[in-house]
Amino acid sequence: MVNEKTSTDQLVRRFIEDLGVTYEEQGSSNIQIKQALRSASKSKSQSGVGKPEFIFFSGNHLIIVEDKLAIDKLEYKNNDGIIDTEFPFRRDYAVNGAVHYARHIIEKTNSYKEVIAIGIAGDGLHYQIHPYFVSETELKKLPEMKSLEDISPENIEEFYKVAVLGELPKEERELREVNKIAADMHEDLRNYGQLEGEKKATVVSAILLALEEPTFSLNQLIGSDRVGGTDGEIIFNAVRVYLENAGIVPYAKVGEMLDQFIFIQRDVTLNTVNSNLEMTPLKYFATTLEAEIMDKIKSNTDFDILGNFYGEFVKYGGNDGNPLGIVLTPRHITSLMAELIGINKSDFVLDPACGTGAFLISAMNRMLGQAENDDERRDIKQNRLYGIEIQQKLFTIATTNMILRGDGKSNLIRDNCLTFDNTIMNGYGINKILMNPPYSQAKNDQTQHLSELSFIQQALEMLVVGGKLCAIVPQSTMVGKNRHDKARKKQILKQHTLETVITLNKDTFHGVGVNPCIVIFKAGIKHPENKRVSFVNFEDDGHVVRKHVGLVGDGTEKGKREHLLAVLAGDEDDGTDLIVKTAIKDTDEWLHSFYYFNDGIPSEDDFYKTVANYLTFQFDMTANGKGYLFEGVEENE
């Protein structure tokens, strides 16, 4: 019979060894801790020596781990919802025992006044990890984990700041800094430039490109009203010279972009010295962007700064603000998707609906991280990243984005990917596609060709045989309940292979009302009848919604992401509540919830959560034009 020493202990031991730290079992060689444990037994009398199952340091943080084989022995809370460390609970429950030892060490030592106490219960397939922060005055439940990766020496300080102190994650701090600049710039563009709508983003793009031109200087902007000498004309000419010397092909693309910037030359408000600023609004904007944004854009980060500027601008109304039209994909999702299909420095990557270029930026960042010399870096930037975008305003932003990051070259095409000649992309040898198809456009028979599945089907034809496509779409896309969706699902499986579908956190697009999933296909190979497809429930991804802030990491997001990737790679195991591998039919709902069967007795909380999930799903389907599926149910029963 499997016992704790050969199952749960081994699981925990592997987790700790993966951290690369020195650990001890059943005690500590640290003099202070050893002394404190002398009277810390979990027995009723507490007269014996306390023997924590695992104890180690990560950085300067003391970690204590207790484990149990049975998941129902993970933790016990009294009627007040408090972890009870009285006997027998400290003996019988993992969390209670770990907290018991932590409190003893805090009380009996001078050096250790904070401890992270962790309870782990279960085995290699079904386990739970509950960490708690223990101090002299506080017992704080921390976010649940899937491994101990988040408390590794490399991650522990960030985890402590986010999970214990309640600070924002590093990425969110960067995002808020940029969004604050964008919000201020929005106000300035409106107040000083009298600009609305898409013109704000166009002005920002033009200035950033002008700042790249070696012959341009802010000192040239003197507020002249002479023909040919206005600040707007100087900026426009700098952009023209820069683009004409950047080797952009086809050359017509230069003309398209310059057409967007023409108004800057003679706009009276932009080119007139403002008495409050003591310069023209254009010079003021250019000075701000050079000082606060330019270095960030060129810092080889996967952060789509221009995209976030655009998102901040369109937040304030107008047609651009349609929440289901243009949806900016969060940074942690673009980078995850690039990793899911293993994008590497030798790939040719396409986003056929590239928007502001966020996916291409993530792909570039990942590829540059693998490059070994300047030639490889130049090759990646100039020859291996492609995009298609139909909307001129987004095309201008995306092109600016890629030019600023790509040594002056951009392989973007302004066209409709649904009607684009696939053979052109086939000629480039595209073997990886990342995409977020336009949402919610197929409302009736006349517009069914605009569905997400239609975009995916067309994109798959642009890949070489064996190429990978990774798309983020509403979960309703995978259901296929109308005749158009059914037909497309059937057609896709005749020519391509479905590999993975990942159900995401419902708040991924917080405030938009879309329940998303990630889908991965292999192109050009008919789906084998008995192939087992991976269906994953990744709703618990370590991101939560904070009031007045939005979606942020809770400190466990990195570990949960690494665990997901390890499970999909076959390097780690998990239960069917996370992943189900099964053969499929085109008539199935391609979602984890369709194939997953939970034979456990649901708790009251589980019941309410399931009902809430169903209502959310119904809303999502209705928002995507599939509300008819819920009509007349009683008549059909």
UniProtKB/Swiss-Prot annotation:
Catalytic activity: Endonucleolytic cleavage of DNA to give specific double-stranded fragments with terminal 5'-phosphates; a 2'-deoxyadenosine in DNA + S-adenosyl-L-methionine = an N(6)-methyl-2'-deoxyadenosine in DNA + S-adenosyl-L-homocysteine + H(+)
Enzyme Commission number(s): 3.1.21.4, 2.1.1.72
Coiled coil: none
Chain's role: A B, G, H and S subtype restriction enzyme that recognizes the double-stranded sequence 5'-CGAN(6)TGC-3' and cleaves bilaterally and symmetrically 10 base pairs upstream and 12 base pairs downstream of the sequence to release a 34-base pair fragment. Methylation of the recognition sequence occurs on the adenine in either one or both strands; seems to methylate restricted DNA. This subunit has no methylation or DNA restriction activity on its own.
Pfam name, any one: N6_Mtase
Record text on activity regulation: DNA restriction requires S-adenosyl-L-methionine and Mg(2+), and is inhibited by S-adenosyl-homocysteine. SAM may be a cofactor for DNA restriction.
Quaternary data: Heterotrimer of two A and one B subunit. Both subunits are necessary for DNA-binding, which is sequence non-specific.
Keyword Nuclease: yes
GO biological process, one term: methylation
Cross-referenced InterPro entries: DNA_Adenine_Mtase, DNA_methylase_A-5, DNA_methylase_N6_adenine_CS, SAM-dependent_MTases_sf
Keyword Coiled coil appears in the UniProt entry: no
Cofactor(s) required for function per UniProt: Mg(2+)
UniProtKB keywords: DNA-binding, Endonuclease, Hydrolase, Magnesium, Methyltransferase, Multifunctional enzyme, Nuclease, Restriction system, S-adenosyl-L-methionine, Transferase
The protein, known as: Type II restriction enzyme and methyltransferase RM.BcgI
Signal peptide feature range: none
GO molecular function: DNA binding; endonuclease activity; N-methyltransferase activity; site-specific DNA-methyltransferase (adenine-specific) activity
Superkingdom in the source lineage: Bacteria
Family indicated by similarity: In the C-terminal section; belongs to the N(4)/N(6)-methyltransferase family.
